[in-house]
Amino acid sequence: MQPGGHILVDDGLVDLEVQDIAGKDIVCKVINAGVIGDRKGVNVPGANLKMPFISKKDHGDLLFGIQEGFDFVAASFTRTANDIREVRKILKENGGEEIQIIAKIENQQGVDNIDEIIEAADGIMIARGDMGVEIPPEYVPVIQQKIIQKVYTAGKPVITATQMLDSMISHPRPTRAEATDVANAIFQGTSATMLSGETAAGKYPVQALQMMSRIAEHMEQNIDYNTIFKKTDRNENPDITNAIAHATCLTAIDLKASAILAVTKSGSTAHMLSLIHISEPTRRRGI
């Protein structure tokens, strides 16, 4: 921290400007005042924080997830691929090697190292709330589009999250801009859209979920996925499953197949096929 820097609280609603630093004390001037509720986040834009990625509490939470049989864990504020490797090491050492890791991209370090993070993680979450505080908001839409494309090309799932239907925390209907935001993420190729405050603390959680579902369903009915798929850049170094899935989808499109039936033992082939957005539905059958 340096004098002149800013400390942002609650997604930037409260803005503090650093005036002086004396040992462990930081004297700030309030630029934007507000009431700070419980458990609100604190952001220091531009700061390169040198602190352990996994706290003692994080370690305990991972062990709890293993004990309860979690399918996924999300790694908040992922900065480098080493952060993901650190989480994976703990999972493997404690019998949780089957748990998949979703890297949450929320700051500039994560954006700068996105390629190595995509390779190390099992999926990516574009957490736009903190990202829009750590990074100028006007940059976020372009970053979102680029990350979605990179993750899609890598054959991994990508989740677009935070403030998608934010007004529905207090109102029964979203703004038109919010509906367009959800639709645009789907058009860009996101694997999933996610609600947070709308369902965790909102007055209309069920209505928010139903609204997002309707927007997604309508968008998918009106997107030419086959054309987009043919124009999309392929992974330059595909593994066998990725290559087979890509070839299968091309064949299905050329033959105008009604569906794709994936005969699979582990489920990985069906999973890969489902990540490739084409119009033909995928059916899974185990062996």
Model features per residue range: what roles?
Residues 1-15, 81, 105-107, 243-257:
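Phosphate-interacting basic helix/loop segments used at nucleotide- and nucleic-acid interfaces
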Residues 1-62:
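Beta-strand/loop-dominated core regions that host nucleotide or nucleotide-derived cofactor-binding catalytic loops
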Residues 47, 52-162, 168-179:
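Conserved alpha/beta-domain cores
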Residues 48-54, 165-186, 221-224, 228-242, ...:
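Active-site-adjacent loop and "lid" segments of alpha/beta metabolic enzymes
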Residues 67, 89-96, 119-123, 148-156, ...:
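Generic secondary-structure signature for well-ordered alpha-helical cores
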Residues 126-135, 182-205:
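Glycine-rich phosphate-binding active-site loops on the catalytic face of alpha/beta enzymes
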Residues 276-287:
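Single conserved hydrophobic/aromatic residue that forms the stacking wall/gate
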